[in-house]
Design a protein with these regions (language model features):
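Structural alpha/beta surface segment adjacent to cysteine/selenocysteine redox centers
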Residues: 17-113
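C-terminal cap of thioredoxin/glutaredoxin-like
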Residues: 2-30, 108-191
Length: 191
């Protein structure tokens, strides 16, 4: 990964905005280096208002509009949070073995969460996705407990701080940040 020249895409399986952003990125033919945003720098966590019910209601309304625009069915109730680093660890081992399968797993994980309402932190869901894409599910499940992979995911907070990434999807090209799925067409015009 070359943070000076590669197109980087920070994502998290928790975010419906990341799902829409990644879909738009792929639809426009962009090929970013995907980086999980599953360990969030402390200073960002302290600044986030997690419990604002009005904001949560608005975000769900907004996501529904965006999903409708993309002709994607959004479940009525998005599953509760899970241990996000573990899910991203499963993705990481698949992506490290095969970039195409990593992308396929990513899209199926988003689909499972936002279209089917499944808990993607559940190992049975991970196993099903792996079986669907032809990847050894045992490797993915073992990755969820792998200390080295977890340390790698934690190390990404250094890059997030350096590039001032604060949410997903964030795409970074030549150190210029593009936050949000609506910035992707403009980014495409620059590349």
């Amino acid at each position: 990964m070359d943070i000076e020249n590669d197109l980087l895409c920070f994502f998290n399986f928790r975010s419906p905005y990341a799902y829409i952003g990644i879909k738009k990125t792929i639809d426009l033919g962009l090929k970013p280096v995907f980086l999980p945003f599953c360990y969030v720098p402390k200073e960002i966590l302290e600044a986030v208002t997690l419990n604002n019910p009005y904001k949560k209601d608005y975000l769900l309304e907004d996501c529904k509009r965006l999903f409708d625009e993309e002709k994607i069915n959004l479940v009525d109730e998005i599953p509760a949070d899970c241990n996000w680093p573990k899910v991203h660890a499963a993705w990481h081992i698949i992506n490290e073995n095969n970039l195409d399968l990593g992308l396929t797993f990513m899209l199926k994980a988003f689909e499972s969460r936002f279209q089917k309402g499944l808990n993607i932190g559940n190992k049975d869901t991970i196993i099903t996705i792996c079986n669907d894409i032809g990847f050894d599910s045992e490797l993915a499940i073992n990755a969820m407990e792998d200390v080295e992979i977890d340390n790698y995911l934690k190390s990404l907070t250094k890059i997030m701080r350096e590039l001032k990434v604060f949410g997903v999807p964030t795409l970074v090209y030549k150190r210029e940040r593009f936050w949000g799925q609506d910035r992707i067409p403009y980014l495409k015009s620059l590349i």
